Amino acid sequence: MHRNQAGPVICSLLSLLAFAVAAAAEPAGSPARLAGPRNAEADAATYDRCLKLAKQNPGAAQSLAQTWHERGGAHPADHCAAVALFGLKRYKEAATRLEALAQAMTTAPAGLRADVFDQAGQAWLLAGDPVRAYAAAGQALGLQPNDPELLLDRAEAAAAVGYYDKAVADLDHVLKTDPKRTEALIYRASANRALDRLDAALADVEKALSQAPNSVPGLLERGNIRRLNGDLSGARADWERIGQLAPGTQADMAAKANIERLDLKARPPPASTSRGQ
């Protein structure tokens, strides 16, 4: 179950409107307020430029964010600095900064703070700390209860920790609102497979693939379930299909590794030889 990859997730961040709200929310004693009236349009342009730079040259974006922070950029500058750290694959530092930022934004709208906690959770996952990721996702949901995107992210963190029942519970909530959500069906299938609930897992993934027949995650998951059910030819067919749809991807590499394991098990043992015969 892998919802978020290291690339674009955290860089599709806050809108400029959210930036304006966060900047306006600075307390009276903050550097932004002490620096005197700010040009909101100029700050919005700096924020936009900083986020774009974080995708292209995160080191330069980090320098820009630091300079901007020293000049009173406050929360938006801190946010861009965290994005730059993410781009540099310094995920633990990015997660720490995002978490601190979300906690500091006490006067910002709940939805904005929830987004930043959620981004911290994504960074914690990539830092290899799913327990912190799960906690951050929980803080996000405390601010924005029942948000389906936040529930999906917490379900991923729960599965990474091994809390498969909790992952299923979050995904149940998502699917009550949107029973046809393919992504959630596949994630729930994965969690149920881990719980050895293979009938439920297969039902979910079959429904997902009936809606999206070329879903690579769905095919990978159904192959896993079919293998556990003893349907080795069906598993092979699903994994080979991934090679046609998404050659060279991580999913394709995982599928090829699964096929190799099938082939190894299918090979007869080498004939034994006895000396002197």
Task: Give the ranges of each region predicted by the language model.
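Residue-level recognition of tetratricopeptide repeat
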Residues: 50-51, 83, 122, 156, ...
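Structural marker of alpha-solenoid helical repeat scaffolds
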Residues: 70-71, 104-108, 143, 177, ...
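Canonical tetratricopeptide repeat
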Residues: 80, 119, 153, 187, ...
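Helix-start (N-cap) detector for alpha-helical repeat units in TPR-like alpha-solenoids
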Residues: 43, 75-76, 109, 114, ...
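N-terminal leader/linker segments that initiate helical-solenoid repeat arrays
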Residues: 22-80, 84, 88-96, 268-277
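Register position in tetratricopeptide repeats
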Residues: 55, 87-88, 122, 126-127, ...
